[in-house]
């Protein structure tokens, strides 16, 4: 009798472990990178130059897809971090960059498909990236103001429509789901 109870408990724990483990795995399929150098850091400009030069390192449709995915992720995380520190102007610019790079990904996938390459795995990754970006953008929407008036010391103020930009960013990602 004790053996039957122990085996039932063991079976329950095993099933629970498998179920919980699968849920965690489903949430972690696409991982965004750790933020790199931020604007204002003395190495930021160097990283920008390396980033531009690395464009030539990634050739072919799959190479360019990877290159633009990497940059889109990088600038989304940069924007997220800057928004958290209330550096709204820099964050706004970073999110614009992320959008620009994100929109360059899909045409390269289409070109690869036209060349007869199997893009199913790359499309899956692109979809996971889109979903992860949407998740982060949704968090940003909840934690940022709708608008912000950026007032530099010796220049005209700039109105940043943060909510509108986040909505645009979401629409760009949803377009490819």
Positions of the model-derived regions?
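Bacterial N-terminal signal peptides
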Residues: 11-21
């Amino acid at each position: 009798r004790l053996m039957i109870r122990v085996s039932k408990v063991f079976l329950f724990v095993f099933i629970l472990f498998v179920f919980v483990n699968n849920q965690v795995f489903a949430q972690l399929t696409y991982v965004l990178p750790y933020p790199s150098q931020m604007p204002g850091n003395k190495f930021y400009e160097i990283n920008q130059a390396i980033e531009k030069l690395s464009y030539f390192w990634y050739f072919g449709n799959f190479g360019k897809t990877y290159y633009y995915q990497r940059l889109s992720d990088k600038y989304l995380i940069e924007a997220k971090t800057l928004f958290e520190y209330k550096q709204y102007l820099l964050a706004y610019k970073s999110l614009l960059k992320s959008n620009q790079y994100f929109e360059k990904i899909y045409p390269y996938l289409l070109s690869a498909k036209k060349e007869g390459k199997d893009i199913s795995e790359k499309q899956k990754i692109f979809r996971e990236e889109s979903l992860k970006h949407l998740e982060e953008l949704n968090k940003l929407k909840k934690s940022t103001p709708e608008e912000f008036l950026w007032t530099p010391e010796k220049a005209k103020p700039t109105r940043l429509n943060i909510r509108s930009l986040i909505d645009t960013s979401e629409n760009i990602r949803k377009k490819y789901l």
